[in-house]
Amino acid sequence: WADLNTNNLDDPGAFYGVTSVYESNENMTITCSTKVCSFGKQVVEKVETEYARNEGGRFVYRIQRSPMCEYMVNFIHKLKHLPEKYMMNSVLENFTILQVVSNRDTQETLLCAAFVFEVSNSEHGAQHHIYRLVKT
């Protein structure tokens, strides 16, 4: 999630990036594909490869401070400058991010997450909900 109430977004030298941490019982190389979709169509995709680090018997994968693409930076700027929250939500209704983490060597999908956004009216800042989809 993101906090649009911060003033740092207007700083010309602001850094826009994402940090992700994954963990596994197995040593492997992973690829993380992040697709930005607008109105159901893919706009941009970023694919990153990460190698395991053994940390106390667990294999940890850290993608740290991965820079956002220019499309995302511009999107955030335009969204932040809309005058009303309902306008922001109208834009966000047609915006999603799909992230797929796979074993690079076997192509097995390890994790698939879809991010759907809305502007929170909460006094407590950004909120999130996590749902797990399973086969029955």
UniProtKB/Swiss-Prot annotation:
Assigned keywords, A-Z: Activator, Developmental protein, DNA-binding, Metal-binding, Nucleus, Transcription, Transcription regulation, Zinc, Zinc-finger
Subcellular location per the Swiss-Prot or TrEMBL entry: Nucleus
Major localisation: nucleus
InterPro entries in UniProt: TEC1_TEAD_TF (IPR050937), YBD (IPR041086)
One of the GO biological process terms: hippo signaling
Ribosomal protein among keywords: no
Superkingdom of this protein's organism: Eukaryota
Gene Ontology CC: nucleus; transcription regulator complex
Any GO MF annotation of the entry: zinc ion binding
Name of this chain's protein: Protein scalloped
Source organism per UniProt: Junonia coenia
